Each structure stands twice: as C-alpha cells, then as structure tokens.
Curated annotation (Swiss-Prot):
Gene Ontology CC terms, in alphabetical order: endoplasmic reticulum lumen; extracellular exosome; extracellular region
Record's keyword terms, sorted: Disulfide bond, Glycoprotein, Phosphoprotein, Secreted, Signal
PTM-bearing positions, type Phosphothreonine: T52
PANTHER family to which the protein is assigned, alphabetical: BPI FOLD-CONTAINING FAMILY B MEMBER 2, BPI FOLD-CONTAINING FAMILY B MEMBER 4-RELATED
GO molecular function: lipid binding
Signal peptide range in chain numbering: 1-20
Coiled-coil annotated residue ranges, if any: none
Modified residue annotations for Phosphoserine: S60
Designated name of the protein: BPI fold-containing family B member 2
InterPro entries, per the entry: Bactericidal_perm-incr_a/b_dom, BPI/LBP, BPI_fold-BPI/LBP, Lipid-bd_serum_glycop_C, Lipid-bd_serum_glycop_N
Disulfide bonds: C137-C174
UniProt keyword Glycoprotein present: yes
C-alpha cells in the first residue's frame, strides 16, 4: 500500500544501509534525526491507524441489533521516538480517534484518546540489510466522550460501545504497526541494489554487523564495494578496521557519516582501472594562441624545429599507469597524480611521430562537497608540476623551459577533465527520496566526516 511504503521510507531514515566485511564507512543517526522522523511521520501514522471497526452487536433488546461504527478521523498530535541503548528505538504516540456510531434515533460521534507504545529491535538479515521487528507493543485508551451530550443513547449502551471499540483497537492497532514494519523490511531489502558511478561502474552498500545503539545515536558499520564491468574493486586487506570517534563533526546534526581512506582509495583505483583519467590534449592549429604545435616546441627544442620546418599539430597523450593517491590530513585533503605524458607530432603522412615522453607528478588540492545524495569534488594544482624526461627522440630537453609550456597547455585540460569526473560524484549511504541538506565536511587524519541534516522528498 502507498501509505505503508511512505511510512517505511520515513522509518528507513533510521537505517541507512551499506557494507561487506571490513567497514569502510560508518553511518551514525543522531537524536535530531529521530526528531525529524517524528515530525514528518505523523501523517503516515495517522493513515495507518485508520482501521476497520466491525459492527457492534447489541443483545440487550428482544432482538439482536447490529450497530455500524466507522472511524471518521485519526489525529496524531504527538509522535516521539527515542533510542534505547543496546536495544533499538521506542515509539511513543498519542492519537485521538473520532468514531461515528450509526444508532437510532440519530448517529452519535465519539472521541477516544489512545496512547501507543512500541519497541523495535534492529538486526541484520542474511543478505546484509537491516531487519526491523516489533518486540513489544501496547496501547492505553482513555474515556470516550460524546460530541453531542443531548443524544438520547442510553449510558449503558455507550459503555458497551466504548468497550467494543477499545477491544477492537487493542487487537488491530499493534497489528497495523507490525504490518508497517514488515513493509519497511521489504523496502529495506531493495537497498542492496547498485548505484551508478559511471557508464560502466557502480557502488553497492551493505551492512557489516548488527547496529550499535546508544542513548544518543544508532551507528551502522557499513562497507562500500565499487564495481567495474561487474567485477569488484579489491584493495589489499587493511588489518585496522575503521572506527569513527564519538565526538566528531557538528554537534546536533541529524546524520554523521564517516568515510575512511579505504573508500577514497577504491574510488581512485576504479577511475584508474576504467581508464577514465586518461586523456588526449590537442589544440587548434590555426588558433593564434595555440601552443600545441611544432613551432611552439621548436622555440624550446631546436631538433623539433629542424625536423618540422612547417607547423604541425602536437598531441599530448596522458595516461595514468599508477593509481592516484588521496592523502587525508587534518583540514587538508590532497591528490597526487603521476601521469605518463607522451608528446607526439603529426608527420607529413598524417602518422603520429613520438617526440619525447615525460614522467609527471601533479599535486592537487581536493575540495569536497555534497549535493543531495552524492559526494563530489573539485581540484586545483598545488605547487609546481614536476617533470622528468622519460625518453626523447629530439635530443636534449631543458625541463625548466618545457615546464612553462606544460603549465599552459597541460594543467587546465587536466583539471577540466578531472573535475568533470569528480563532479559526477559517488552515491552516499541513503534511501530513496532522502537527501542530505546543509552538509558540513570535516577532514581528519585518514578519514572524512560529513555532518548533515536530512530532507525526505515525498
């Protein structure tokens, strides 16, 4: 049912799934998240409590008198969720029911206040998704009140009707909540699906172990597995599991997400294996400001001018043979790229001729951001680009002079290409229609923390 699915999504805010064996990510939902769920969960809960009341059978007269009773409205003025340390989440709700009793000589409206209490335990399924179960549920109903005190219905009959209604609610409301939880479990089972990273790559999250619950938060150890062409990206086993310290990020935030060095290493290895970091840099030969031609190179390298008396196009083939390295230090995130750059010129027969090749080291400042459900990044060059001549078919090369040219024709295309890749982003742990809002990102030694609010878009 639609309302069950929506309420399931709301409750799933408590359980952002992810993981495999060694946790590379920790997701912590704080008290503020429970407050948010409590507020937006009232309307779906009201719809869930709209149960059917069977006819009341009146045996007091000479003949059996069936009386139809219908719930006109359910209003939930208060819904409160709280963490129970070492256990799960407790639900406390106050609901006001309005009933219409179709009784001669005229219908009667009654109101009945009800207090609901349910304790939920969160465990782990065999497919590494959360499983929510109701361990205890009870309700406490108050005294029913008539809307119109002038109604001629006898007090004795009202007592019997009220007893009938309370008995029905005692049987049905906890069952209704239990059915909602089952709907939540069906929904959570879909969270092991793959989220696209690129055209041929995906990320999958799954839980590592049973959640840890304290009086302040619920913490899930999760692992992100990246796939390229259906095959997982495997890193060397790290004997030290990632542990998110207790007091990190912004106090009072709804969600605290810790991303280990392992996740960044996997993402960069994925980009390198996919060849996504490779690029060819070319220029427009007839452009006045084009420096990617043999004339510009010939002014720096005499042998190029001798071999190419007429200006010919030059191509820089940039290949990443070594995996980029992310370095996470307090308040500082950097990337190191070590591309191999081959410089080729187009000969008169349109074939490419290798002029020389360079081993390059580029250090980049990494700025992280979050957009809705994705972690994104932008880079800028940090310091000077380091060049070493790997091979040359044009004699001696003065790397100091070539460095000036490379800074003009190499850095900007490389940054544009890399930033376009990082802008695609990588999906963070979450559920359908749930977005991170007003996130703050903190870089610590060996890990990154995202402190964020949450917004559910229905």
């Amino acid at each position: 049912m639609a309302w069950a699915s929506r309420l399931g999504l709301l409750l799933a805010l408590l359980l952002p799934v992810v993981g495999a064996s060694t946790p590379g990510t920790v997701v912590r939902l704080n008290k503020a998240a429970l407050s948010y769920v409590s507020e937006i969960g009232k309307a779906p809960l009201q719809r869930a409590l709209q149960v059917t009341v069977p006819h009341f059978l009146d045996w007091s007269g000479e003949a059996l008198q069936p009386t139809r009773i219908r719930i006109l409205n359910v209003h939930v003025p208060r819904l409160h969720l709280k963490f129970i340390a070492g256990f799960g989440v407790r639900l406390l709700a106050a609901a006001n029911f309005t009933f219409k009793v179709f009784r001669a000589p005229e219908p009667l409206e009654l109101t009945l206040p009800v207090e609901l209490l349910a304790d939920t335990r969160v465990t782990q399924s065999s497919i590494r998704t959360p499983v929510v179960s109701i361990s205890a549920c009870s309700l406490f109903s108050g005294h029913a009140n008539e809307f119109d005190g002038s109604n001629s219905t006898s007090h004795a009959l009202l007592v019997l009707v009220q007893k009938h209604i309370k008995a029905v609610l005692s049987n049905k409301l906890c069952l209704s909540i239990s059915n909602l939880v089952q709907g939540v479990n069906v929904h959570l089972g879909t969270l092991i699906g793959l989220n696209p990273v690129g055209p041929e790559s995906q990320i999958r999250y799954s839980m590592v172990s049973v959640p840890t619950v304290t009086s302040d938060y619920i913490s899930l150890e999760v692992n992100a597995v990246l796939f390229l062409l259906g095959k997982p990206i495997i890193l060397p086993t790290d004997a030290t599991p990632f542990v998110l310290p207790r007091h990190v990020g912004t106090e009072g935030s709804m969600a605290t997400v810790g991303l280990s060095q392992q996740l960044f290493d996997s993402a960069l290895l994925l980009l390198q294996k996919a060849g996504a970091l490779n690029l060819d840099i070319t220029g427009q030969l007839r452009s006045d400001d084009n420096l990617l031609n043999t004339s510009a190179l010939g002014r720096l390298i005499p042998e190029v001018a001798r071999q190419f008396p007429e200006p010919m196009p030059v191509v820089l083939k940039v290949r990443l043979g070594a995996t980029p390295v992310a370095m996470l230090h307090t308040n500082n995130a950097t990337l190191r790229l070590q591309p191999f750059v081959e410089v080729l010129a187009t000969a008169s027969n349109s074939a490419f001729q290798s002029l020389f090749s360079l081993d390059v080291v580029v250090n980049l400042r990494l700025q992280l951001s979050v957009s809705k459900v994705k972690l994104q990044g932008t880079t800028s060059v940090l310091g000077d680009v380091q060049l070493t001549v790997a091979s040359s078919n044009v004699g001696f090369i003065d790397t100091d002079q070539v460095r000036t040219l490379m800074g003009t024709v190499f850095e900007k295309p490389l940054l544009d290409h890399l930033n376009a890749l990082l802008a695609m982003g990588i999906a963070l742990p979450g559920v359908v229609n749930l977005h991170y809002v007003a996130p703050e990102i903190f870089v610590y030694e060996g890990y990154v923390v995202i402190s964020s609010g949450l917004f559910y878009q229905s």
